Amino acid sequence: MLPEKQIHPFPPLYDAASEVLILGSFPSVKSRQQCFYYGHPQNRFWRVIAELFKSPVPVSIEEKRNFMLRNHVALWDSIASCTITGSSDSSIRDVVPNDIGLILASAPIKIICCNGRASFDCYNKYILPRTGREARLLPSTSPANAAWSIERLVGAWEEILTK
C-alpha cells in the first residue's frame, strides 16, 4: 500500500451543549468509507464510551451521533489533512491540523482529550499554540493498542466524566 494524500472527509460532531471534546488523529480507511468516527469494527472506542456512560453500545451512525450529543461529548480529529498509508498513524506525514477554535467558540468545552499518542502529539505541536488549552492524553482505543484490555481502557478513560 502506498502513502496517499488524504483530506478529512466529514465534519466534527458537536453542538452548543458539548462539554468534552475527544480528538482522534485521522480517520481510518473504514471510517473514511463510512464518513463517521471510529468505524473499524475492532476499534474499541464505542465499547469504551458505552461502558463509561452505562449504556448499550450504539450501532448505527445515527445512534452514535445521538449518543454523543446526549452525553455532551464532541468528536473530531487533530488532523485536517495528511499523507497516510492505509490507517497507520505511524505513517502520517505532511500534517495540516484542524482548527478546533470553531468548536471552542461554539460550545462550553471543559476538557479536551486525545485518543492516542498521534493525536496528542499533533495537538501539542499545532493546536495548543493556537488555543492555549491543554489536552489530556488517553490510551488509544485502536486495535493496534492490543496491550490495553477493554477494562483497562475504561478505567483510563473515566477521566472524561470528571468534566
Predicted regions and their residues:
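C-terminal capping/extension of enzyme domains
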Residues: 1-19, 41, 88-101, 124-163
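Short, hydrophobic/glycine-enriched beta-strand segments
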Residues: 19-25
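Short loop/turn segments at strand-loop or loop-helix junctions that form parts
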Residues: 25, 78-80, 140
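Short catalytic/ligand-binding loop motif for oxyanion handling, primarily in non-cytosolic enzymes
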Residues: 29-32, 83-86, 120-123, 143-147
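Short, surface-exposed acidic-centric catalytic microdomains
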Residues: 30-91
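Alpha-helix N-cap/helix-start and coil->helix boundary motif
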Residues: 43, 119-120
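Internal catalytic-core helix/loop-beta-alpha segment
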Residues: 70-119
